[in-house]
A protein has these predicted regions:
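Compact soluble domain cores
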Residues: 2-62
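Short, compact, well-ordered microdomains
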Residues: 58-102
Length: 102
């Protein structure tokens, strides 16, 4: 098994291994802006004890053109119906990252 932090980092950087959801506020932006926001999510590395107390790299926020952008990774079973019983096991877990305006 791999640790949750590594699985989350790999997913966040590649967007492979789960689903990425953009809220209405993000989708309303120009295509170029959405691409820039997605790139900032992929490159995010400002993890601190305050925003990452469990060292899972499952949440981040940054400013983009005067707006705060948040992203959060949640862990679901393979059918996306229930929360995963073991987020460190990719055999039983799908990741869902939601990117939104604060």
């Amino acid at each position: 098994m791999t640790d949750i932090k590594s699985l989350n980092d790999n997913f966040r950087k590649s967007f492979n291994g789960g689903k990425v959801l953009l809220t209405t506020g993000i989708n309303a932006k120009r295509q170029e802006e959405v691409a820039e926001i997605l790139n900032q999510v992929r490159c995010f590395n400002n993890f601190t004890k305050a925003n990452d107390p469990y060292n899972e790299h499952d949440f981040g926020s940054f400013d983009y053109n005067g707006e705060k952008i948040l992203w959060k990774i949640d862990y679901y079973d393979k059918n996306y119906r229930y929360l995963s019983e073991n987020p460190s096991n990719p055999e039983v877990t799908n990741r869902v990252m939601t990117i939104m305006l604060a």
